[in-house]
Amino acid sequence: MELIAILLSGILALVSPVGLVLDRTVESAIRSRFDKIEQLQVRIDNAPNYQIVQGKVERVRVAGRGFWLTPEIRIAALELETDPLDIDVARLQKRGKAPVTTLLEQPLQGGLRLVITQQDINQALLSPAVTKRLSKLASRILGSSAELIVQRYEFVNPKIELLGNNRVRLQLELQEQGADKLSVSVETGVSVAEETKLQLIEPSVLVNNTPVPPPVVAALLSTLNDRLDLSTLDDAAIALRILKLDVNREQLEVAAFVKVKAPTAVPSVR
């Protein structure tokens, strides 16, 4: 959701107090919100100039490679194509620190495509900030059982291997203070059901190279598949629906439908 807000804040550079702004200004605004972007193209399908001044835009297309959110987190490729935008220009000019999602007159919809390579994933997993956020995310999705594990163990040396055919392998070590490390390997298929529910398919788990009994894995799988619903991550303004999830041996590709809701309780200042 943070990524969507970053892109939206860059797109809002379309409209300024002085009126019409060119594609390059939007490109520059998007670049300024990332640590680095290797390649970037922005195309704006213009409405008549007077409509753009009023905050109305037919369509915005953003495409590029090498989007670095931080020095550790890289997205290999990103494409975004929006439906028509309707921006509250007066509120935009007076926004201060207001969230970008409060600046829309009408809901904004669009298509998003992301590609992340195995190398990018493992580079990100080396960052303590990333592993900390993933631990919090696991606690949020899976509830108290995951939270107890996160509190008890330190996650060490996590590594992802993309196996192709929508299967992945996660290897890591669990370190409990004053105890030996536990080596954990999880291999599973992944898919998306009903556009929001992440499903684990035929998982296998090894702890210290010993297979976890199938009944235990089946019980864990039932619990996980009931709780891995991405809609729980929707915030009040941004919703995400997964249309495609493809994992090959080199990269993970996601295509999604994004909807940014227009504010209902914020009065217009026009």
Tell me what each language-model feature is:
Residues 2-17:
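Hydrophobic membrane-insertion alpha-helices, especially the h-region
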Residues 35-120, 131, 135-177:
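N-terminal beta-strand/beta-hairpin edge segment
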Residues 87-89, 105-111, 125-129, 216-219, ...:
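A general structural signal for short secondary-structure boundary/capping elements
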Residues 183, 188-270:
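Extracytoplasmic/luminal low-complexity segments enriched in Pro/Gly and acidic/polar residues
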